[in-house]
Amino acid sequence: MKELETRVMDIDVDDIRNKMKSLAAIKVKSEDQVNEIYDFEDGRLLANKGYARVRTTIDRLTGKETVFMTTKKMLSQGTFKVMEENETIVEDGEMARRIFKSLGLVLQESISKYRESYKINDSLIEIDINDKSFCPFPYLEIETTSEEKLEEILKLIGYTLADTTSKTIYEILAERGIEGEIKGR
């Protein structure tokens, strides 16, 4: 599935929550995540702005655990990122890990974060608060289907396209001099 994706960095989390409430946005997620990023030993997926991932989520409201197996690949990067995402829920996280490993992929990094997601105008607005050792600042990720919808959402929450970035989180961290475990970042 293709999605348009952009980020707004260094947000005021309480301000965004208040805006979501005032806009009557529907809260669809409040979860803790562990994202295990896989790539080949030579790093070719990440070098081409893609990756394989096993994501384990724990819903903070119900306690339910869900495991997703995903591949992502950037198709283009301009005002926003156009991503191809292929994802499925799996019954057995360990089996998902073994499948990736059997394809020659190796675990590159394991990233913990809290994510709070809202739906508004057929778009998803996500507050991401990562483990500080990975990314020390909160940000918004907005996923939608058109530039028009993106501009509309941004206006509703007090931002413009100029406030956004299509850079990957790894590019943003590298720009800020924040080193990570993954080769080349």
Where do the model's predicted regions map?
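N-terminal strand-loop-strand beta-hairpin
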Residues: 1-122, 160-161, 166-185
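A structural feature that tracks compact, well-ordered secondary-structure segments
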Residues: 51-57, 71-72, 128-130, 143-145, ...
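Long, well-ordered alpha-helical scaffolding segments within enzyme catalytic domains
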Residues: 151-162
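Short, well-ordered alpha-helical microsegments
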Residues: 13, 147-150
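Bulky hydrophobic/aromatic packing residues
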Residues: 139, 146, 175-178
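Conserved, surface-exposed functional patches that form binding/active-site neighborhoods
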Residues: 109-144
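Short, structured patches in soluble enzyme cores that scaffold and shape functional sites
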Residues: 8-10, 92, 129-131, 143-146
